[in-house]
């Protein structure tokens, strides 16, 4: 209930304070978090790109009640909620570079939500960004611009929220 929301403590398994060095990368992540900006990180393997991206949700503002409800509903629709109750931490989605178009934007007969919707309210991290299929990268245009994704099916159109911070990484 809303009383529980006001008293909740959000805890993450990771902490942005764990990142040592990488001052420019940390500054980029702080700017991304403060302004809800998307970001591209380029650097050698083992340079800390994934570590910083995984910790980005921990420096984003706490979720509002409405965000918690919305993220919980999204996870419930695809069976990820289980008995967790209300989701209180921002999502972090890290799809593999072999992810299909349907898994990224959603699809199927029932218009199932994809990674861009599962990342709603949090972070979508695309490591090895140049390895993703061109059509997957192109399909990100709509959610990045409108913060929603539309899936057209013969039964009708499904419009899902897709308000996330996109972090791309490459070597």
Question: Model-found features: residue ranges?
Answer:
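Peripheral, non-AAA+ core regions of ATP-driven protein-machinery
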Residues: 1-40, 47, 152
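Conserved AAA+/SF3 P-loop NTPase catalytic/coupling segment centered on the Walker-B
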Residues: 112-145, 171
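Walker A/P-loop
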Residues: 34, 39-84, 141, 146
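Long C-terminal interaction/binding lobes of large macromolecular proteins
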Residues: 13, 17, 59, 107, ...
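AAA+/SF3 P-loop NTPase mechanochemical coupling elements
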Residues: 92-93, 114-121, 152-171
């Amino acid at each position: 209930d809303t009383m529980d929301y006001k008293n909740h403590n959000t805890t993450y398994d990771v902490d942005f304070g764990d990142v040592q060095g990488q001052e420019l990368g940390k500054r980029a992540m702080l700017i991304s978090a403060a302004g809800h900006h998307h970001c591209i990180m380029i650097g050698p393997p083992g340079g800390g790109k994934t570590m910083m991206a995984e910790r980005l949700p921990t420096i984003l503002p706490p979720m509002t009640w409405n965000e918690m409800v919305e993220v919980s509903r999204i996870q419930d629709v695809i069976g990820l909620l289980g008995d967790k109750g209300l989701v209180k931490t921002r999502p972090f989605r890290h799809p593999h570079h072999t992810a299909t178009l349907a898994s990224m934007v959603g699809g199927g007969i029932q218009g199932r939500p994809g990674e861009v919707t599962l990342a709603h309210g949090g972070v979508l991290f695309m490591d090895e960004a140049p390895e993703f299929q061109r059509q997957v990268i192109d399909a990100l245009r709509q959610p990045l611009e409108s913060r929603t994704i539309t899936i057209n099916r013969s039964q009708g159109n499904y419009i899902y929220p897709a308000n996330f911070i996109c972090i791309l990484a490459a070597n």
